[in-house]
C-alpha cells in the first residue's frame, strides 16, 4: 500500500482587509431653483421657483405652496424684482390680448 504525505496547506491574506466605512453615499439632487426665467410667458399654475424656505418671496399673482414652491396664479409675464433692500420677489403680470 502506498502511503502519501499530504501537505498541510493554509492560505493567508497577503493584504489587510478593506474594512468598512460609514461614508460613501450621497443624497439625491432635489432639483431646486428657478423654473421660469425673467420675461418668460407662463400659464396659470406654472411652477416658477422651487425652494426650501423663502429664498424668494411671492409677489403679484404668485402663490406659495406647502413646500415653499412659488407658482403663477394667472397667465402672464414673469418678473424677478427686489423687495426692499435685501429681499427678492417674483411676480406675474398679465399681458393684454
Swiss-Prot record:
Sorted keywords for this record are: Ribonucleoprotein, Ribosomal protein
Query: Has keyword Signal?
Result: no
Disordered as annotated region, ranges = 14-37
PANTHER family recorded: LARGE RIBOSOMAL SUBUNIT PROTEIN BL27M, RIBOSOMAL PROTEIN L27
Post-translational note:
The N-terminus is cleaved by ribosomal processing cysteine protease Prp.
* Family of the protein in this entry: Belongs to the bacterial ribosomal protein bL27 family.
Q: What are the annotated GO cellular component locations?
A: cytosolic large ribosomal subunit
Q: Which residues form the propeptide?
A: 1-12
Reply yes or no: does the keyword Membrane apply.
no
Taxonomy, superkingdom: Bacteria
Q: Which GO terms describe its biological process?
A: translation
* Disulfide bond sites: none
| UniProt protein name | Large ribosomal subunit protein bL27
Q: Example GO molecular function term?
A: structural constituent of ribosome
Q: Which organism is it from?
A: Streptococcus uberis (strain ATCC BAA-854 / 0140J)
